[in-house]
Amino acid sequence: MQEFQKTLEEIFRDFHRHPETAKEEYRTTQKVREFLEKQGIQILDLPLPTGVLAQVGSGEGPVIALRADMDALPVQEQTDLPYVSETPGKMHACGHDFHTTALLGAAALLKEREAELKGTVRLIFQPGEEINYGALAMLGTGLLDDVQEYYGLHTDPNIEAGTLGIRENAIMASPDWFGVTIEGKGGHGAQPHNCIDPVPAMASMILALQQVVSRRISPFSACVLSVTRASAGNTWNVIPGTAEIEGTIRTMSDEERDLGEQLIRQTAESVAAAYGCTAKVGYKRQSRPLINTPALAAFTTGLAEEMGIPVIRQEPSMIGEDFAEYLKDHPGCFVRVGTGIGPALHHPKFTVDPSVLSGTAEFLARTAQKRLEALRNA
């Protein structure tokens, strides 16, 4: 196991030194392919420019999938790691280098145990998670149509290294975007009576949107609405003709998501009209809420405890994760992996503790083995 851990740490450090952002994971894709080919693992013909899809098993019986994302972020690294990013302005600040390495480790373990597998394990090395592209792109190939269950993981800087965070039902939110353009009538700053000023409309709209969560959505529902940008005009003595705001709304269910969009549109249009303006509302749905299957959350918790891995009941997060797309029509479970207490995800000083790589790989491999056995015996 020590040699296995050493190998994984070398792979991890290489990925960390060479981060690639969404849709640009060409080197990462090649390195993943090289490792899998060396292990004798079958690589499927994936019709995407980046990403890898492979499989281990008999090709018969049940099929489950293990998924890792590969993309980095446009962040300038500020750690003092000996394997700091060598690409200016790019960094693995969300642990996807860890995810990819752990799945490669699981792939190697599953290949060693291939004769014991009661079905097939599909290995998803996914591009473009950070832009909500990769999961839908992978699903759109049709190469996952026979998968019965999906499993994935994510590093967590709020959990001690070696501990897993698992929770049933809603665990991550839908990270939707909204934007509003308020159209009035511009003119001289000394003559507001000859204008239709969009600036006070914008100010009132920001305040009104803050009431959506506190007054229109049940306090028993998890929902966050943040206006994150506001702009109007470009000089001091001119009333602008337009003003803009944009922000995000996060919800934990499809019903709350629908309601949130409806209320944003209704509020923006009503406030604009009250000031004599009009509002053009844009709304973009990103990944859906991530809902873990209760029975499989219980299964993975039990398996971890059997393996001697500490488990905590994970707190829900209002961050989004496109692994949710795999679970839209299929059961599965998304697990948080404690990689040491430290700076937050997406922070330029974010780090993970690579010493838990081999244990994480073993957990993924055992999950696949045990779930295939359970499905075969069902």
Indicate residue ranges for each PLM-predicted region.
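Acidic/His- and Gly-rich active-site-bordering loop/insert found
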Residues: 1-92, 97, 101, 108-117
